[in-house]
Amino acid sequence: MELENDKTSSKQLQIRLVALNKRFDTSGNLLSLPSRFGCDELSETVHTLLSANDIEIPASVQFDFAINNDLLRDSLEGYVTSKNLSTESVIEVVYFQKEPPPDFLNTILHSDWIKSVRSKDDCILAGSLDGTARIWNMAGEEYAIFKGHESYVNGVEWISKDNNHATIVTASQDGTLRLWEWAIGTKSVECLCECKGHTQAVNAVTVNQSKTKICSVSSDKMIKIWSTDCSRKDDDTTHPIHKKMKTNQGLQKAVDKLPDITLSGHTDGIDAVVWPKEAEIITAGWDHRIKIWDTEVGVNKSDINVNKVVKGITCSPFQDLIAAGSFDEGIIRLYDPRVVGDQTVLKLTLKSHKNIVSSLCWSTTDEQQLVSGSFDNTVKLWDIRCNLAPLYSIEGHEDKVLAVDWSEPQYIVSGGADNRIQIYQREVAQRS
């Protein structure tokens, strides 16, 4: 099939367009298209074919295109030449709805490195090397500050948030975790309890889906699970949380809390943890291992040998996939954790970063997309169907990116060694 308005082109390529979404299926017709065509012209071609098949979509919908899992960012001729592909063979080009580019929204400047970030509604929770955690809104207004740790805050997580109160957890280099309550609309914060049990730095923390348990991982090689219930009882041990910290009620007391469960098995420090299912946690760190644990019986179900130190992991909310960032020239590896024979399956790799991948976060609304942050100062937005190049590379940081978050679909948030929180806003595409 040759489109009429393309007959003026002197060089034609045989192209088969294949839709990844049935909504946009054009039946895979074989087309003769000008080699000069790029994404804009191919999008127009798809619209023409859809209209010919009586499929109505808004004119504003644009498409991305990929050949052999590599995003097309050049003309067809440029791509074919750069990859030494035959111009005599049929070239299969897959297409899918284009992701709108993230728009810069705001920069929040801090006094020290930002080690962790988590967004919730219109709020950002961040932990810093200055020993504090803070909550800001997206406009950069500081809502609350949490002081009490004796060293860096390495990890933060929201436990709950309603119109009146928010509960958070912080994990610190001082070997402790603290649960805090913030009275929304005020600067009032209270340390509810201090979790003690680790003997070295607590590097990361996460919360289960029901918000009843916390999991922490540490340089002491241990995994500890704690209850989020900090109810005070008559026999609870209490102590001042900070000599200089007072509220309207006077010096606050915090409950000392011990872990419910301790899991051992890693042979070196642990840097990353996620809790994708109610009875399953996944941990990773310096022993080159990703470990999957059954929290109900407290056993290590399976291991993935990455052969590199793992700095960050994320899990797809939609499918059995684990993405891991490690100490090897910026490669992100995606694994299927289901064991086949005696091994897990390496599904694919994402390659574009030029340094250590420090943090990852999967989209909560799109099973194909995730974001990554790296010591190369960039944040990248990926579609795993096109693993050879990111959809977008965001270059707002001036030093290492240490944390990324995509908990809220409309905001991509990152923190780094440049003392900055960068906020990017997304247009959430309407998809079928």
Swiss-Prot record:
It comes from the Eukaryota. Residues 13-97 are annotated as: Ubiquitin-like (UBL) domain. WD repeats lie at residues 109-146, 148-190, 197-236, 265-303, 305-345, 352-392, 396-432. It is found in: Nucleus, Nucleolus; Nucleus, Nucleoplasm. SMART domains: WD40. Keywords: Nucleus, Repeat, Ribosome biogenesis, rRNA processing, WD repeat. GO terms for cellular component: nucleolus; nucleoplasm; preribosome, large subunit precursor. Its main location: nucleus. PROSITE patterns: WD_REPEATS_1 (PS00678), WD_REPEATS_2 (PS50082), WD_REPEATS_REGION (PS50294). GO terms for biological process: maturation of 5.8S rRNA from tricistronic rRNA transcript (SSU-rRNA, 5.8S rRNA, LSU-rRNA); maturation of LSU-rRNA from tricistronic rRNA transcript (SSU-rRNA, 5.8S rRNA, LSU-rRNA). One of its GO terms (molecular function) is ribonucleoprotein complex binding. The keyword DNA repair does not apply. Required for maturation of ribosomal RNAs and formation of the large ribosomal subunit. Belongs to the WD repeat WDR12/YTM1 family. This is Ribosome biogenesis protein WDR12 homolog.
